[in-house]
């Protein structure tokens, strides 16, 4: 199957350009904010709409700074250390989910400390809405023809323009489906059916656990990062970074359900 060659740039006016990738971040944050407000209205956790509104700026900074530094330090440090100015060129791509997640957690901690908000209540809300952004981000990765999968002979293999001429797994779409849509449904079902927000850290634990399981599995189909390759002969960086998430998530689930 030939890649549906979609221009990564939606439109441009002079040097100013709007890309699908940047738009996915904007829409993801707005939809996440809207969904989080609906959750707060229904369940009235120890988070108010005003708290959420005040946190948006912290969240955006955490996502961008954490995501970018995570990519720079974990995936291609030699390039950026030799050309530090490139670190600021986020429009060229290069964001790490694990770095962004850590950035948001740090931002949430600083916010909660300043405004005297319960940290676990806030991170439970964040975890519940994050799959929206994950779904949109992976779709944008697919449009950009980046982060594609390994070579496959299956009928749904796609020839990406930025790779060789071999058909490859559309691993971005696998991630969009499982880390985005399926994970969103799991957390929505847990939240609305089983009222998991009543148990602090349970939604956070569910998110970390299922995201890690999905990511570790889908990495089997995803081409390892060229500048890193395999680690310990068979593991990818994404799998290694997801293992601590799996351990922490499982621990939070056990701790919150046994109380």
Curated annotation (Swiss-Prot):
Top-level taxon of origin: Bacteria
A single Gene Ontology CC term: plasma membrane
Location of the protein in the cell: Cell inner membrane
EC annotation from Swiss-Prot or TrEMBL: 2.5.1.145
Keywords: Cell inner membrane, Cell membrane, Membrane, Transferase, Transmembrane, Transmembrane helix
GO molecular-function terms, A-Z: phosphatidylglycerol-prolipoprotein diacylglyceryl transferase activity
Entries under InterPro entries matching the protein: Lgt
Transmembrane spans: 16-36, 55-75, 92-112, 117-137, 172-192, 201-221, 228-248
Protein name listed in UniProt: Phosphatidylglycerol--prolipoprotein diacylglyceryl transferase
The organism of origin for this protein: Rickettsia canadensis (strain McKiel)
Gene this chain is encoded by: lgt
